[in-house]
A protein has these predicted regions:
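Intrinsically disordered, low-complexity non-transmembrane regions of multi-pass membrane transporters
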Residues: 102-123, 184-200
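Membrane-interfacial helix-loop connectors
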Residues: 90-115, 124, 142-162
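Hydrophobic core segments of alpha-helical transmembrane domains in multi-pass membrane transport
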Residues: 2-9, 37-41, 72-80, 146-150, ...
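Short helix-coil transition sites and intra-membrane helix breaks within transmembrane domains
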Residues: 29-30, 42-51, 81-98, 133-142
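Alpha-helical transmembrane segments of multi-pass membrane proteins
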Residues: 66-81, 109-135, 159-173
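Hydrophobic transmembrane alpha-helices of multi-pass solute/ion transporters
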Residues: 1-39, 43, 52-56, 200
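Juxtamembrane and boundary regions of transmembrane helices in multi-pass small-molecule transporters
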Residues: 89, 151-200
Length: 200
C-alpha cells in the first residue's frame, strides 16, 4: 500500500512504479540472490543441515578440525577461481563447515570446549575470506580482477585480465598454503590446550 501511495503522490503512476521496481530489482539482483541464499540456508538449518554435516564427518575418526578447515580452503579457492560463491560465512561456513569441524572433536568422544569452538569459527571464517579474496582475482572478468586492473591502469600500468590472472596464480597458491599450514598448526596447538592427553 505504501509503495503504491508513494508512487502515485510522487507522480510516477502505476506504470512508472512498475518500471522503477523492475529496474531496481535487476540492478540489485545480487542482493536478491543474497536474500534467497539466507532464506534457503535458514530453512535447511531448521531441517537438520548442521546435524547432517556433523554426523557425516563423525564417520572419519582420523580427521581433525584443522584438516576440515584446510580441505574447505582448497575447495573454496578452486571454486573462487571460477567465481562461484558458496554464500560466504553465513551461508556456508556457519551451517556446514563449523559443524563438521566440531564433529571431528565429538567423534573422538570429547565435549567441545566453548573457547575452542570460538577459535574454530574464526579460523573457518578467515579461510573463507583468504580464499575468496585471492581466488576471485583468478577469474578473468570477475569484479576483483576488474578492480585490480582499473587500479593498476590509474597508476600507469596497462595489463590485460589474462596477464593479471597469470601473475595472481602463485600469489593465490602461496596464500592458500600459508593459511592452511597456519590453521592446521594452530588447531593442533588448541587441541592440546583444551583436551590435554586426549589424543585429539
Amino acid at each position: 500500500v505504501a509503495l503504491v501511495v508513494t508512487a502515485l503522490t510522487g507522480g510516477l503512476g502505476i506504470q512508472g512504479m512498475l518500471e522503477l521496481l523492475g529496474t531496481s530489482f535487476v540492478n540489485n539482483r545480487g542482493m536478491a540472490i543474497f536474500i534467497i541464499i539466507m532464506l534457503a540456508t535458514g530453512t535447511l538449518e531448521r531441517n537438520g543441515l548442521k546435524e547432517s554435516a556433523a554426523s557425516l564427518i563423525k564417520r572419519f575418526k582420523k580427521v581433525s578440525a584443522g584438516m576440515i578447515v584446510d580441505i574447505y580452503g582448497i575447495f573454496r579457492m578452486i571454486f573462487a577461481a571460477f567465481n562461484v560463491s558458496f554464500g560466504g560465512v553465513a551461508g556456508f561456513v556457519r551451517p556446514i563447515i563449523l559443524p563438521m569441524a566440531l564433529g571431528t572433536i565429538e567423534s573422538k568422544g570429547l565435549e567441545v570446549h566453548p573457547k575452542h569452538e570460538e577459535e574454530l569459527k574464526g579460523m573457518a571464517s578467515a579461510m573463507e575470506n583468504v580464499c575468496w579474496f585471492f581466488g576471485q582475482v583468478l577469474f578473468i572478468g570477475g569484479a576483483g580482477a576488474l578492480l585490480v586492473q582499473s587500479t593498476l591502469k590509474d597508476l600507469g600500468y596497462d595489463v590485460t585480465l589474462g596477464q593479471l590472472a597469470l601473475v595472481e596464480v602463485p600469489v593465490a597458491i602461496t596464500a592458500l598454503v600459508v593459511a592452511s599450514v597456519y590453521f592446521y598448526l594452530k588447531e593442533k596447538k588448541l587441541a592440546k590446550k583444551y583436551y590435554p592427553g586426549k589424543g585429539q
